[in-house]
Curated annotation (Swiss-Prot):
Keyword terms, alphabetized: Crown gall tumor, Plasmid
GO molecular function, one term: DNA binding
Stored InterPro entries: DNA_Partitioning_ATPase (IPR050678), P-loop_NTPase (IPR027417), VirC1 (IPR009744)
Protein name stated in the entry: Protein virC1
This protein's record includes keyword Isomerase: no
Organism: Agrobacterium fabrum (strain C58 / ATCC 33970)
Amino acid sequence: MKLLTFCSFKGGAGKTTALMGLCAAFASDGKRLALFDADENRPLTRWKENALRSNTWGSFCEVYAAEEMALLEAAYEDAELQGFDYALADTHGGSSELNNTIIASSNLLLIPTMLTPLDIDEALSTYRYVIELLLSENLAIPTAVLRQRVPVGRLTTSQRAMSDMLASLPVVQSPMHERDAFAAMKERGMLHLTLLNMRTDPTMRLLERNLRIAMEELVTISKLVSEALEG
């Protein structure tokens, strides 16, 4: 089982949204997934509850409470026994022994960020913290920045400047663009199953097209992430 961790010091950086999106992309490819909910607010647990009500949750995916060390250890042990392909961890903001343990146990680390000065500053701080932690533990774990909520059209001058600041860091080649489909995942459930349900409703054709474009974007990102995980 490979562990993919989403981490950022900043709340609202897009960790949970990125995890939900990649979860849908991996699941659509037949992967079995364990989700470690290490945020004390348990956003993944609420996501599953919403999805079950909408019939947009798959049996190939399970959410584990992991906001305490004992819960994390139990979750990891059970997920290994269940034979999941990937575990996706949603950390809480800031640094802690729990976050450090998750980071040090990972096969790949993703640091989501939006292209604003505050977000980029927090992403750089998170990246420095992660690298220093890995060096102190004599670990070499691939770490990359995932750009979030990038405009579909042209970037502003400020956004281009923020993007340029990331040039010296490993960055996932394809970003997640700003799309209603991504913003609505928390309420609608797994994107690929939401899309599947809409395909049977001719009145939802325009929305279905938007969801399909969003899903294609996630599949592209998931392939890049899978290559790094399996590499």
